[in-house]
């Protein structure tokens, strides 16, 4: 948990992802298309990726990828992010935490 806390405190938007996950790809594309430059951790490529995935599960993230943190706060997975986007809450949230300026 401590490692995750350190990782999410480094940037406004952090995405925990997996290269082989289509929903991870969708969420990364959404943020990039919005003009956000998220920090992306590919759990299938980094050291201790399985440990981090286990810690995300302990936080209640299911499935464990993709998982998005904005402003150091857990937003959730693809369903939660897409819901925020569709109800027009995502962009104001990104602006509030300095991840988006326009």
Swiss-Prot record:
Keywords: 2Fe-2S, Cytoplasm, Iron, Iron-sulfur, Metal-binding, Nucleus, Redox-active center
GO MF annotation list: 2 iron, 2 sulfur cluster binding; metal ion binding
Record domain Glutaredoxin: where: 1-101
Gene Ontology CC: cytosol; nucleus
Recorded family membership: Belongs to the glutaredoxin family. CC-type subfamily.
Primary role: May only reduce GSH-thiol disulfides, but not protein disulfides.
UniProt-recorded name of the protein: Monothiol glutaredoxin-S8
Highest classification ranks of the organism: Eukaryota, Viridiplantae, Streptophyta, Embryophyta, Tracheophyta
Record gene name: GRXS8
């Amino acid at each position: 948990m401590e490692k995750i806390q350190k990782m999410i405190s480094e940037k406004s938007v952090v995405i925990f992802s997996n290269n082989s996950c289509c929903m991870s790809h969708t969420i990364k594309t959404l943020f990039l298309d919005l003009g956000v430059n998220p920090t992306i951790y590919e759990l299938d490529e980094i050291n201790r990726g399985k440990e981090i995935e286990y810690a995300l599960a302990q936080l209640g993230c299911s499935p464990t990828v993709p998982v998005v943190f904005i402003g150091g706060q857990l937003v959730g997975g693809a369903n939660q992010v897409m819901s925020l986007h569709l109800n027009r809450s995502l962009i104001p949230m990104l602006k509030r935490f300095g991840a988006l300026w326009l």
